[in-house]
């Protein structure tokens, strides 16, 4: 409560009780329970599970305040590993219990389950979604510009050249929304910069 988390190129900062309050700085150390890297690129708070997800240039970290320690996820030789350590953006999809993320150089988008035991030495399996030109149900474009979760738990993914891909909470295939000059209520361009949701 009443906390601000700040990611920087030199550690993770936790500010308590406003600008004149206390603060803590978390940096990588020799301990396995420290943050995976000092270069923090994005943050996502999981309100359902009271934990912080941290994107860095060297993998993912999950911080649980009640335990005051980090669980780190990096690439491994296994097929269900995360595809790259240099993570760029995060989204916690609270209803589906997934963490969505993009990386700096690998195409497409990725997700993994946020439901796993912190004491486990194995990270949760990661899923990678990439455009397949012969599969119309694959993601529309590998250039991901923005992604959000709506209140129903569906994920909307904006792309650089091919509109919006939509992934239902209950399905595993993408449907697409693209510019159609015959549809006056549709997208006005296939180049998507940002997506947001409205509250009633």
Summary of predicted features, one role per range:
Residues 1-200:
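Carboxylate-rich, polar loop motifs that coordinate divalent cations or form catalytic acidic clusters
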